Amino acid sequence: MKVFDYIIVGGGSAGCVVANRLVSAGKRVLLLEAGPRDNTPFIHIPATFVRVLGTKRTWMYETEPEPGANGRVLVVPQGRTLGGGSSVNAMIYIRGQAQDYDTWRDLGCDGWGFDDVLPIFRRCEDNGTLAGD
């Protein structure tokens, strides 16, 4: 029987990062993910991401009827593969609005203001061909 120091449930972005950090620190980690590996080309070619929607690599959640959408039920696809939503989002990265982070800070979440998280965003972003913040 294998023994692990940590069991992480969910192989989305956060689960994979936490697992990597723990393994790098010499810990034995079991990472559990409901879906398959992210080895389909449709995850890695931006224009083809729609080919993974409704497959074993996504959960297709539905909202309740939305009054602001004329009573329609909206489909909210979520990742069910290693990498989670980051693997099924057309390879798009968008920072949140600065005001949202500042609101979290103002509500008592110390360290979550935009100026606090901006250095972390910059550390995660690596595109040498573009410039600017």
Feature map (PLM): residue ranges:
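N-terminal redox-cofactor-binding region of secreted/periplasmic oxidoreductases
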Residues: 1-133
